[in-house]
Structures are given as structure tokens and as C-alpha cells.
């Protein structure tokens, strides 16, 4: 079932800017392994669900998957063949605004090889470049860019 907000204050939102890196959610917090975004992009609720299904099917219901992003921004679209003007289009779907360095998915309770392959399958469903990260590398300071 696709992720959608239960209720929202405003149906239509501005597009906004995606400058800079993520402010929070940059470390693996729940599982042992994570999938980190290397680019900023909108990720739709269907792409999130496709990545989740790919991971859980590969793991054969073993381990646990945490989804660290949620599609809370609506995007609009006008009908095909509709001319410019006459207002903003109707809401067409939901997206999560993902900035670079954000941990999008986490896995726990499986081996590193299984987690690495599951994350590779999940990354193939997403429109951005991703990186496999481990919790112990971040705790040891391996997540810095000074190396």
C-alpha cells in the first residue's frame, strides 16, 4: 500500500528548493546497514514502496527494514491538452524531499552480503545515486570525507 499522509493542512504546495545536505537523519540509527542518498531529489511514494518490496523479497521476510523517509509533499499536474493558465493543477501524487547524505532505508538482522544485495536492488528502483553504509563505519568515524 503506497505511503500517503492521513490528512494535510493544504492540498497544494510550492515546489521549494533542495539546496545543501540533509540537516538530520545522516546516521544509521535503527539497523546495522543503511542506504544513503548521494544526490538531492524527490522520491515518490511508489518508488519508496518498490524499493521496500525489492528488499523484503530478497531477504525472504528475514531481518527488519526501516523506512526513514516519508512522502509528505504533494505535487500537482494539469490534464493532458489543457492550456496554460486558469489556476494550479489538481494534486497528482506525494513525494518525499530527500537531500544528499540522508539515510533513506535501514536493514537489521541479516548478514552484510544479504544487506548489501538487498540495498543494491532497492537503489535500482530509485532515481538517484545511493551508497551502502554500515553503522560501525560511522561510529568509528569512517563516514567523514577527510580520508
UniProtKB/Swiss-Prot annotation:
PROSITE patterns xrefs: RIBOSOMAL_L16_1, RIBOSOMAL_L16_2
Protein name, per record: Large ribosomal subunit protein uL16
Gene Ontology annotations of biological process type: translation
Gene Ontology cellular component terms for the protein in this record: cytosolic large ribosomal subunit
Keywords: Ribonucleoprotein, Ribosomal protein, RNA-binding, rRNA-binding, tRNA-binding
Function: Binds 23S rRNA and is also seen to make contacts with the A and possibly P site tRNAs.
Organism per entry: Lactobacillus delbrueckii subsp. bulgaricus (strain ATCC 11842 / DSM 20081 / BCRC 10696 / JCM 1002 / NBRC 13953 / NCIMB 11778 / NCTC 12712 / WDCM 00102 / Lb 14)
Alphabetical list of CDD domains matching this protein: Ribosomal_L16_L10e
Family, per entry: Belongs to the universal ribosomal protein uL16 family.
Entry-linked NCBIfam families: rplP_bact
Subunit description: Part of the 50S ribosomal subunit.
GO MF, one example: rRNA binding
